[in-house]
Amino acid sequence: MKTALMLIAHGSRNAAANDDLYALAEELHHARVYAAVEASFLELAEPTIDAAVRRCLLQNAERVILLPYFLSAGVHVRRDLQDHRDRLAQEYATVEFILA
């Protein structure tokens, strides 16, 4: 089963603040552990979660691990990301979405 890893951060209007996530995604991509590695942001930056999922699916991912990249497990991690996972699972019923 082709598994993709999708890193999800909050996002910032300050583009430089988002660079760490892009760098981590690039390093993980080069490790070739996953069929695809994508960075995504909950808000304020691109790509969005939906856009990153589409990129994973274009690379034929059958499973997508949604990995939160947050300092603490606040409302976004405990509630919002679970809501995204549930919606994606309904929209793409043939793909397994795992919220790590």
Residue ranges, per PLM feature:
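Active-site-proximal alpha-helix that buttresses catalytic centers in soluble enzyme cores
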Residues: 1-100
